[in-house]
Design a protein with these regions (language model features):
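Short, charged, low-hydrophobicity "junction" segments
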Residues: 4, 66-70, 138-139
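Juxtacatalytic substrate-recognition/specificity segment
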Residues: 17-129
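Low-complexity, flexible helical/coil segments
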Residues: 28-30, 64-68, 99-105, 132, ...
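Acidic/His/Gly-enriched intrinsically disordered linker/tail segments
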Residues: 87-94, 108-112, 127-199, 206-251
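C-terminal single-pass membrane-anchor helix
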Residues: 245-298
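Sec-dependent N-terminal signal peptides
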Residues: 3-13
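Bacterial Sec-dependent signal peptides at the C-terminal "C-region" and cleavage site
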Residues: 12-20, 249
């Protein structure tokens, strides 16, 4: 904690580093207001773009900028900034990343955030980007950035008894959400991508992205990749969620058992005491009966 306090104080004296460089997607202007190495960030950007270029092909060239911000000014401009690690804008293409010293994430995690937001740039440059539902955009970006974790799976599992939360069409846009709803929407988005690849075959989400880049709408891309209309996925979604995520609840079972262990011990103590009392009463009754028998014999 002391490190972050010192950093925040000192960061006000750090001058922004700004320079431009060419990429496979066009010229990138990097504005770095953090203490991170600009050259290392540049290399990460170039590598992630190269990876997506090799996997999904070329996209229209256009200039874009990436700002690493070390203050909270953006929170007044974007309602989700205080919960986000990065935000991507279109027209013009711009990524704003929260300084990892403020968000308190590791450099490894920060590089994943870069990959996530660059993925948004890629899909935003498709001809029919406006047809892509938000759940697919976020889930696919999380997959590419390797951000899908056990946390997201447990969050889904803990809500499988609430069917109203799993109407996937409600997540075409993320609007009017509080913090809890916002994080659940991301968990649901990650689950949707996992289920797409499980139900319709490995790399289904990748094939959808390729069709999008080729100029098709999301609905047509989904059909070409799966052989089904998108409604098929919407109808199956909740049942597939229950079937594939319910068992994750049991991962928390040891922790839950530990929490109620004192109650279990108390109940066990009283059950044991009651049983012992019954045994003692039985022995006493047998002794009384033996005494009666002895008296009758005499």
């Amino acid at each position: 904690m002391l490190y972050y306090i010192i950093y925040i104080v000192c960061s006000s004296f750090i001058f922004a580093s700004e320079f431009s460089f060419d990429t496979l997607w066009g010229q990138c202007t990097l504005v770095n207001k953090s203490s991170l190495s600009s050259n290392n960030i540049k290399e990460t950007i170039e590598q992630e773009i190269q990876n997506m270029y090799e996997s999904y092909g070329s996209i229209p060239l256009n200039n874009f900028s990436i700002l690493i911000d070390n203050n909270h000014v953006q929170s007044s401009k974007h309602p989700h900034w205080k919960w986000s690690l990065g935000i991507t804008y279109k027209n013009p293409d711009k990524i704003i990343l929260k300084d990892p010293a403020i968000s308190k994430i590791s450099l490894k995690k920060f590089k994943k955030v870069i990959a996530h937001e660059l993925n948004h740039i890629m899909l935003n440059r498709t001809q029919h980007y406006h047809t892509i539902p938000r759940w697919f955009k976020e889930g696919f970006a999380m997959k590419i950035a390797d951000e899908i974790s056990m946390y997201h799976k447990l969050k889904i599992a803990s809500n499988t008894n609430k069917p109203s939360l799993f109407h996937l069409t409600n997540y075409s846009r993320f609007q009017g959400m509080n913090k809890e709803e916002f994080h659940f929407a991301y968990a649901l988005s990650s689950a949707s991508i996992l289920l797409l690849d499980k139900i319709y075959g490995n790399r289904t989400s990748d094939r959808i992205a390729i069709y999008l880049i080729d100029g098709l709408t999301f609905q047509r891309s989904f059909y070409n990749a799966t052989g089904f209309q998108i409604e098929n996925f919407y109808q199956r979604f909740y049942n597939e969620i229950k079937k594939n995520f319910f068992w994750f609840k049991f991962i928390n079972l040891p922790k839950n058992l530990f929490a109620i262990m004192p109650l279990i011990l108390i109940i066990g103590f009283y059950m044991k005491s009651y049983r012992n009392k019954q045994i003692i009463e039985k022995w006493e009754l047998e002794e009384e009966l033996e005494k009666i028998d002895d008296t009758n014999i005499n």
